[in-house]
Amino acid sequence: MSSGADVPSDAPAHCPGTQSDDAGKASACAGCPNQQLCATGPKGPDPAIALVRQKLADVRNKLLVLSGKGGVGKSTVTALLSRAMAHRNPDENFGVLDIDICGPSQPRVLGVLGEQVHQSGSGWSPVYIEDNLSLMSIGFLLGSPDDAIIWRGPKKNGMIRQFLTEVDWGQLDYLVLDTPPGTSDEHLSATTFLKGTDGSWGAVLVTTPQEVALLDVRKEISFCKKLAIPVVGVIENMSAFVCPKCTTETRIFPARTDGGGAEQMCIEMEVPYLGQLPLDPRLTKCCDEGKDFITEFPTSPAVVALEEIVTKVRQFFGDGKGERQ
């Protein structure tokens, strides 16, 4: 019997798993695009798992940020959570790892687009946004931000392995991983590596209120349950637009008429609900310009809501400093 972590996302039904002795040879493997690779590839645990565990030994908590559908603001939420925790806890260290290989956006959102990664004796040095907040992204390795990355799964997995084994993060209290939408090779690779590390880990899922987004985030929750990924909770992003002049609230993406939305979905699927982040056009502008929305607009309803979400995230990890200061 195979574990979910060694079954490729595009595998047929009844796949024996890549580590099985029947990999590439079972009747279920007929017609699978991975058949030849599985039949001839090495069996047994990936030796990189032990190396990742060693390299991340000083990383206390690992947080995956997931979304079922693109365009729900997952990368924005990743940046907001990371900045908010770094601001609140200046005596702690935070890292962001952008594993959205084909669509790296963190360098722009965090205001370090065009920076270069430097090599040291202990590996790649991440780019620092603040004294206690650093970032690694494939965006730093491209000749131009307009360059397309056209890679198949194995090469993406190799890049993630390299990020986890060759980046000199140092001591971190939180490593936040920005992932691509859906449940793809990047998610399977990251999950396999993180499961073998010490410390705590879990996933925050980001959605918008409308049913078409909730449909996919339900699948993401199912993915987490199948792979035993602890679910920190669900954030409903762009829940409403709050006018900065009159504070009138308008639902841009209304939920189902039967009282749905992310909160009801969390009740149905028995996962924590972390809260709502209202839509603020100023946040979009800050992301485009790489500015810190939290310090630019500290009284924004989005920042107020974010602080409450950060408290819940830190409490999930058993952090006594999760309470608002």
From Swiss-Prot:
UniProt protein name: Cytosolic Fe-S cluster assembly factor Nubp1 homolog
Residue sites binding [4Fe-4S] cluster 2 per the record: C243, C246
Subcellular localization, as worded in the UniProt entry: Cytoplasm
GO molecular function, one term: 4 iron, 4 sulfur cluster binding
Residue span of region Disordered: 1-26
Subunit architecture: Heterotetramer of 2 Nubp1 and 2 Nubp2 chains.
Functional description taken from the UniProt entry: Component of the cytosolic iron-sulfur (Fe/S) protein assembly (CIA) machinery. Required for maturation of extramitochondrial Fe-S proteins. The Nubp1-Nubp2 heterotetramer forms a Fe-S scaffold complex, mediating the de novo assembly of an Fe-S cluster and its transfer to target apoproteins.
Residue ranges of the TM segments: none
GO CC, alphabetical: cytosol
Family that this chain belongs to: Belongs to the Mrp/NBP35 ATP-binding proteins family. NUBP1/NBP35 subfamily.
Main location as per UniProt: cytoplasm
GO biological process terms, semicolon-separated: iron-sulfur cluster assembly
Cited InterPro entries: Mrp-like_CS, Mrp/NBP35_ATP-bd, NUBP1/Nbp35, P-loop_NTPase, YlxH/NBP35
UniProt: ATP binding residues: G68, K69, G70, G71, V72, G73, K74, S75
Cofactor note: Binds 4 [4Fe-4S] clusters per heterotetramer. Contains two stable clusters in the N-termini of Nubp1 and two labile, bridging clusters between subunits of the Nubp1-Nubp2 heterotetramer.
UniProt binding sites for [4Fe-4S] cluster 1: C15, C29, C32, C38
Alphabetic keyword roster: 4Fe-4S, ATP-binding, Cytoplasm, Iron, Iron-sulfur, Metal-binding, Nucleotide-binding
Cofactor(s) demanded: [4Fe-4S] cluster
